[in-house]
């Protein structure tokens, strides 16, 4: 068996937490091959999952195994940003969502290059490492071009098989048509602009926008902060007839999937500047929601489908026009979001037009969304994605024969 050390935000309620659990769950499908030990790390200020079902108990078991084990490992898998990558074992695999802008920091490339394999969530995440114009200064003062050289696999998230909770009574909405957006409130998600443009487009109509958000955590102080931020935006529109609904706090998987299927929540809208993948977008897509989003970054992997015999993929969402421009000064984060990087800016009139089309042509847009849902359950099933993860790892794993069980033709009786 291969002793695997997994360092990841396994218990974090975050995108990287989801990614970590995806990797561990995939490894766990091959218990005859992988002996798993987990070190769950924090992920910023995000809370930990509060579900104490059988999966959480299993993750706790893998954590206890690691604490009690003092030996070495054959393979390490690290789900985090590249500057935190280290060589914990003879073979090391980095797993990351990359960056939401058009390029990663040079330090990310340097650290990724020490990995034996990189697994990224999307083609956009991979592209951020592949730019040819990256320069670094050597200790002797020389400027040298930095090229990405790590072997890389692009593996998307799988669909989740969750029994959605009926939220029609728990979340009472007065309007029959409501848009939904799920976003942590920060520079990248562009929430303030979305609220403004929604109000301006539907100012005199009884239409709603359900905003599931937080700033950092899911505590009462965070809720009050988000409430104040929403009030600041809507204060400029005192006579509006449309409605903004703020949802805040922890929601279970069953509740979140119930939100996507709420009978009065019809469509999903985002004006994000960029996504490494876009998990809420993905969940909305495989739940059959019509979607409007900028046609740029990680979510393009799953919002378009391939058609047999055709080179170009078919767009299955309402594409919002955009410009690619430098990130805002306040969004720059040295070593993560470099000030010379760029991401997309949804155009105001295109966003309003996309929302109007989802509202006016709902029946046709819903039909397209159902076709996308059907396709995603075929291409992104848990079995398919978990096999992709396992196969990618076994390509670099030490002395691993993934087919050893199938090659046994006879068991001797002694």
Question: Where do the model's predicted regions map?
Answer:
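Donor nucleotide-sugar binding/catalytic pocket of nucleotide-sugar-dependent glycosyltransferases
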Residues: 117-164
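Acidic donor-binding loop of glycosyltransferase active sites
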Residues: 258-276, 286-289
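Short hydrophobic beta-strand element within catalytic cores of glycosyltransferases
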Residues: 290-293, 304, 310-319
